[in-house]
């Protein structure tokens, strides 16, 4: 299996996404004409089982952006312990994108290297680990984007879509150009779709975040949450996720994966003729 992925390379893992994106066993009844797009970035994974239960109960296909982050149990989000969890999500028909391997937060563009290649300064920080300041060339940043896709294919047998989310949403035109040259298109989130699960829970209690989301979210919005935030004392997902889902559905909204978003649909189908990664 490792040899198969090595031969396919990034093109096989990403460009096959349109042909091999996991499909649900049965599509939910009825057309989704007022969609919102629920997305999750990795985190400490403490609420990941709950998130999976809620999504399955309501037949929601979401989009996950993956980084190699520390977990509450002392492992990593993309280690062998979590491989079955990711395989199950893939089989349910969710979408997956890169969140960079080391959770690199862009700080600034640097002068080009001697060969003219773009360079960037990042703060790599994940969970409770000490931040690391490091400098990467465009080529090295490309490798940081590719590693989650390669690892995801290795542990699940499914390809990752050619999309990424920059940690903290911090980018520059040069960074986006470097990612695009590497085969990745950036996905952010809507202003109303910032669900606030990484905010201080004393200043932004769950009830307030839920009320705000239900009031402000509109069709077409991309929503952002996480699979566990170390710094939030009162976890968001147990209190807010299901009421948010049912509340938005009561307003006539529905949920769709990013492959159905008008901005990304063509991109995520672009590799329909490519050889797909295979299930192990």
Which residues fall in each region the model found?
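C-terminal domain-boundary segment and adjacent tail
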Residues: 24-30, 62, 72, 233-280
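N-terminal signal peptide c-region/cleavage motif recognized by signal peptidases
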Residues: 17-18
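His/Asp/Glu-enriched short active-site or ligand-binding loop at hydrolase and phosphoryl-transfer sites
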Residues: 170-216, 253-264
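Acidic-and-aromatic substrate-binding clefts and catalytic sites of carbohydrate-active enzymes
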Residues: 42-47, 68-81, 104-109, 163-173, ...
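Bacterial N-terminal signal peptides that target proteins for export
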Residues: 1-12
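Active-site beta->alpha N-cap acidic-glycine motif
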Residues: 24-120, 125-130, 144-162
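Extracytoplasmic/secreted proteins, especially bacterial periplasmic and envelope-associated proteins
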Residues: 35, 46-50, 57, 81-84, ...
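Hydrophobic residues in well-ordered beta-strands that form the structural core
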Residues: 64, 96-98, 188, 225, ...
């Amino acid at each position: 299996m490792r040899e198969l992925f090595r031969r396919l390379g990034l093109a096989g893992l990403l460009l096959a996404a349109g042909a091999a994106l996991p499909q649900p066993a049965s599509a939910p009844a009825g057309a989704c004409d007022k969609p919102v797009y629920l997305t999750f970035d990795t985190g400490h994974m403490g609420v990941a089982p709950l998130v999976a239960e809620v999504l399955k109960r309501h037949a929601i296909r979401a989009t996950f952006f993956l980084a190699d982050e520390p977990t509450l149990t002392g492992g990593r989000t993309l280690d062998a312990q979590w491989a079955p969890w990711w395989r199950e999500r893939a089989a349910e028909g969710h979408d997956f994108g890169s969140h960079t391997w080391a959770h690199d937060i862009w700080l600034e563009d640097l002068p080009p290297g001697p060969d003219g290649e773009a360079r960037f300064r990042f703060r790599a920080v994940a969970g409770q680990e000490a931040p690391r300041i490091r400098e990467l060339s465009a080529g090295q940043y490309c490798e940081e984007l590719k590693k989650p896709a390669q690892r995801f294919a290795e542990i699940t047998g499914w390809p990752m879509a050619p999309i990424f989310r920059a940690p903290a949403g911090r980018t520059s035109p040069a960074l986006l150009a470097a990612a695009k040259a590497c085969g990745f298109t950036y996905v952010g989130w809507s202003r109303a779709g910032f669900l606030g699960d990484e905010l201080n829970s004393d200043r932004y209690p769950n009830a307030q975040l839920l009320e705000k989301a239900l009031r402000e979210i509109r069709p077409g919005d991309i929503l952002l949450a996480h699979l566990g935030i170390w710094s939030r004392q009162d976890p968001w997902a147990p209190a807010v996720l299901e009421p948010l889902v049912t509340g938005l559905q009561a307003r006539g909204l529905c949920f769709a994966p990013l492959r159905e978003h008008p901005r990304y649909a063509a991109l995520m189908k672009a590799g329909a003729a490519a050889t797909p990664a295979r299930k192990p």
